[in-house]
């Protein structure tokens, strides 16, 4: 019973992955408790070392059936669902919703057979489940030596690392925030009063509105008001974005090539195609750009490559990672096989992936990989042009600015006419792409965008 298998909406694992990986997350126990199984924090992505507990979909006493979602887990990549494929009853929740940085392998819940008395697990603890898994290795801090008077006494056991000493439980960043009521916090922010060091007179030492008022009236507060700020917790996705971009800027020697592209013909073609679509599709400028990237990459394949240990991998297919801004951060879903797709298919795929990204429902195979990227900020009229950071291990990314009306010479009475232009800036990894190759790729991109009928061939 309950050889539980893991299935996620975001990625259905292979049978071999279930056989080798899931067993580590469900452990059968007997001891002084009725027969039960400990459910542990699973590794829901290849790089996941710890996760945050989201909303529990089951509570103690609830039955769980095949395919039911047990709990939402935030990984270093996205919000994912943790599901079981067999039945049982939840006897105990060991990690509450909102708990953060729980190492993979740590106990999070207890599962029993139908009919088991779950009241027997009322006092079941993490220790009864074998304890939390070790956290990812961190630099060790030097221990301060004991005073001479203490060293003369009998030796004491080696103390645990400081980060685990918090009155018997792990102290999170949220635990270290000042204990302050909402009204007091609001008043302190309005009056520019620092709550650091304020002594609370409320229940359990909570800082009250009255405490803040006293601080406002004190001479120190009136003479030297301190700056106010708010510390915002960092999500798993934010950490991943930060780590990958730091890695990219430190290991990829970027160089940039910029060109102004006339898109007047492209805009007219787009308007004509959309007008004749009868609502079946609505093409965007970005759809044309994605297709143009594939055309240029087939003509200059060195750009559609990545740096690997000992070799440069040049891809035959063009899978374009499209940067999408979501409430939790930037993610790059992939339009695969762009070289073989038409504009309508590209448009449909981009819209579908963007919606999934904003809803947090992308599967890992929909955002992991890609051979080249595009980042479009053209919807913001203030952005003429910008440079983008390469998405490793790719070797190139195209940054797209907004469309501008530019006066150009013309053989008419005024001597000028206005042309719709976009400034494109390509970032290249110089380990993979030489300057002349990058320039050639941008030339091919310019050629096809300024003659957009070629995209229909």
UniProtKB/Swiss-Prot annotation:
Species: Fusarium oxysporum f. sp. lycopersici (strain 4287 / CBS 123668 / FGSC 9935 / NRRL 34936)
Stated name of the protein: Dihydrolipoyllysine-residue acetyltransferase component of pyruvate dehydrogenase complex, mitochondrial
UniProt xrefs under CDD domains: lipoyl_domain
Compartment list: Mitochondrion matrix
Chief localization: mitochondrion
Signal peptide limits: none
One Pfam family, short name: E3_binding
Modification type N6-crotonyllysine: residues: 148
Effect of residue 148 to R: Abolishes crotonylation. Decreases pyruvate dehydrogenase complex activity, cellular ATP content, and conidial germination
Taxon lineage: Eukaryota, Fungi, Dikarya, Ascomycota, Pezizomycotina
Transit peptide, residue positions per record: 1-30
Keywords: Acyltransferase, Lipoyl, Mitochondrion, Pyruvate, Transferase, Transit peptide
Biased composition regions of type Basic and acidic residues, renumbered to the chain: 139-149
SUPFAM superfamilies assigned: CoA-dependent acyltransferases, Peripheral subunit-binding domain of 2-oxo acid dehydrogenase complex, Single hybrid motif
A single GO BP: aerobic respiration
Similarity section: Belongs to the 2-oxoacid dehydrogenase family.
Modified residues (N6-lipoyllysine): 77
GO molecular function, one term: dihydrolipoyllysine-residue acetyltransferase activity
Annotated InterPro entries: 2-oxoA_DH_lipoyl-BS (IPR003016), 2-oxoacid_DH_actylTfrase (IPR001078), Biotin_lipoyl (IPR000089), CAT-like_dom_sf (IPR023213), E2/Pdx1 (IPR045257), E3-bd_dom_sf (IPR036625), LAT1 (IPR006257), PSBD (IPR004167)
Function comment: The pyruvate dehydrogenase complex catalyzes the overall conversion of pyruvate to acetyl-CoA and CO(2). High pyruvate dehydrogenase complex activity is required for sufficient energy production during germination of conidia.
Cofactor: (R)-lipoate
Span of domain Lipoyl-binding: 36-112
Quaternary structure annotation from Swiss-Prot or TrEMBL: Eukaryotic pyruvate dehydrogenase (PDH) complexes are organized as a core consisting of the oligomeric dihydrolipoamide acetyl-transferase (E2), around which are arranged multiple copies of pyruvate dehydrogenase (E1), dihydrolipoamide dehydrogenase (E3) and protein X (E3BP) bound by non-covalent bonds. Interacts with SIR5; the interaction is direct.
PTM notes: Decrotonylated at 'Lys-148' by SIR5, which inhibits the activity of the pyruvate dehydrogenase complex (PDC).
């Amino acid at each position: 019973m309950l050889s539980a298998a893991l299935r996620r909406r975001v990625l259905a694992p292979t049978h071999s992955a279930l056989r080798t990986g899931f067993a580590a997350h469900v452990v059968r126990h007997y001891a002084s408790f009725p027969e039960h199984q400990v459910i542990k924090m699973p590794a829901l992505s290849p790089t996941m070392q710890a996760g945050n507990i989201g909303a529990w979909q089951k509570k103690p006493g609830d039955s769980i059936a095949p395919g039911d979602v047990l709990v939402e887990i935030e990984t270093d990549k996205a919000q994912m669902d943790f599901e079981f494929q067999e039945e049982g009853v939840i006897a105990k929740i060991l990690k509450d919703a909102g708990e953060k940085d729980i190492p993979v392998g740590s106990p999070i819940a207890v599962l029993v057979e139908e009919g088991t008395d779950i009241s027997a697990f009322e006092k079941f603890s993490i220790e009864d489940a074998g304890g939390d898994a070790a956290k990812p290795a961190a630099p060790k801090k030097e221990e301060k030596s004991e005073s001479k008077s203490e060293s003369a006494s009998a030796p004491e056991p080696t103390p645990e690392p400081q980060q685990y000493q918090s009155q018997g439980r792990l102290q999170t960043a949220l635990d270290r925030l000042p204990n302050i009521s909402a009204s007091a916090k609001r008043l302190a922010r309005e009056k520019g009063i620092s709550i650091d060091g304020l002594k609370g007179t409320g229940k359990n030492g909570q800082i009250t509105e009255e405490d803040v008022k006293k601080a406002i009236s004190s001479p120190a507060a009136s003479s030297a008001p301190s700056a106010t700020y708010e510390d915002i917790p960092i999500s798993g996705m934010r950490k991943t974005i930060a780590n990958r971009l730091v890695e990219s800027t430190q290991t990829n020697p970027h160089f940039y090539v910029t060109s102004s592209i006339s898109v007047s013909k492209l805009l007219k073609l787009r308007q004509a195609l959309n007008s004749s679509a009868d609502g079946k599709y609505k093409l965007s400028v970005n759809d044309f750009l994605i297709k143009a990237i594939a055309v240029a990459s087939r003509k200059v394949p060195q750009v559609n490559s990545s740096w690997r240990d000992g070799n440069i991998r040049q891809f035959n297919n063009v899978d374009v990672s499209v940067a999408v801004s979501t409430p939790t951060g930037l993610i790059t879903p992939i339009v695969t096989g762009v070289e073989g797709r038409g504009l309508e298919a590209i448009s449909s795929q981009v819209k579908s992936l963007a919606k999934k990204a904003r809803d947090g429902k992308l599967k890992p195979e929909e955002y992991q990989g890609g051979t080249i990227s595009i980042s479009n900020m053209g919807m913001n009229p203030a952005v003429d042009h910008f440079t983008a950071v390469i998405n490793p291990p790719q070797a190139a990314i195209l940054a797209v600015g907004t469309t501008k009306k530019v006066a150009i010479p013309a053989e008419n009475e005024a001597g000028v006419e206005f042309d719709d232009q976009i400034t494109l800036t390509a970032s290249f990894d110089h380990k993979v792409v030489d300057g002349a190759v990058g320039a050639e790729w941008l030339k091919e991109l310019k050629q096809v965008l300024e003659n957009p009928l070629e995209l229909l061939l």
